[in-house]
């Protein structure tokens, strides 16, 4: 999603949100990520300005005080950015890939089923369309944020094809966009 993303070319406008809209977004985030509720006031303080950065391809990025926190496409579910995920790793369920998949994931490739079922990988139960953090064998922080294209049981049974769609990874355009004022 952010492979060819460039801050100067891809951003179309930025809108400061009203408090009523912010409350709606917060309740949507709590519904989507139940573990985030105790930390939500720390992530999104009440007095800090909350803005939506609108980008090409119907992508919206939620920012608080210039810090990029969540993104979504076409009014879909919110996904945390990797910077936020590194601070609060418990927001998303995790899947682990083996060492051989690291360079492909960091170049933006989708995660294939064999990379999730081989020795060194750990596949945790997850349903289709679940947003997950993908970590690597022997690494502490997440490599990418992805969407499960198959359930964990189907990945183990079929062991072919795309298991997780890579939507945001380290060193992509969104990662290089540090803050937005």
Curated annotation (Swiss-Prot):
The protein's predominant localisation is: cytoplasm
Where is it located? Cytoplasm
The reply to whether Coiled coil figures as a keyword in the UniProt entry is: no
SUPFAM superfamilies in UniProt: PUA domain-like
Molecular function terms from GO: RNA binding
Q: Which domain of life is it from?
A: Eukaryota
* Gene Ontology process terms (BP): formation of translation preinitiation complex
Cross-referenced SMART domains: PUA
Residue ranges of coiled coil: none
PUA domain boundaries: 92-171
Question: Which controlled-vocabulary keywords does the entry list?
Answer: Cytoplasm
A GO cellular-component term linked to this record: cytoplasm
Q: Extra notes?
A: Imprinted gene expressed from the paternal allele in fetal spinal cord.
Family to which this protein belongs = Belongs to the MCTS1 family.
Name this protein carries in UniProt: Malignant T-cell-amplified sequence 2
This protein's encoding gene: MCTS2
């Amino acid at each position: 999603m952010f492979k060819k993303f460039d801050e100067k070319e891809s951003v179309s406008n930025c809108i400061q949100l009203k408090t009523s809209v912010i409350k709606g977004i917060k309740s949507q985030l709590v519904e989507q990520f139940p573990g985030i509720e105790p930390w939500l006031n720390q992530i999104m303080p009440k007095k800090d300005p909350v803005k939506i950065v609108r980008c090409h391809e119907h992508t919206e990025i939620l920012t608080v005080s210039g810090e990029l926190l969540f993104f979504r496409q076409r009014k879909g579910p919110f996904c945390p950015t990797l910077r936020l995920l590194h601070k609060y790793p418990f927001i998303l369920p995790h899947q682990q890939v083996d060492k051989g998949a690291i360079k492909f994931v960091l170049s933006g490739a989708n995660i294939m089923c064999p990379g999730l079922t081989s020795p060194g990988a750990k596949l945790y139960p997850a349903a289709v369309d679940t947003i997950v953090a993908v970590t690597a064998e022997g690494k502490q922080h997440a490599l990418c944020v992805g969407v499960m294209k198959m359930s964990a049981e189907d990945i183990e049974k079929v062991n072919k094809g795309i298991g997780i769609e890579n939507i945001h990874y380290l060193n992509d355009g969104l990662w290089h966009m540090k803050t937005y004022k």
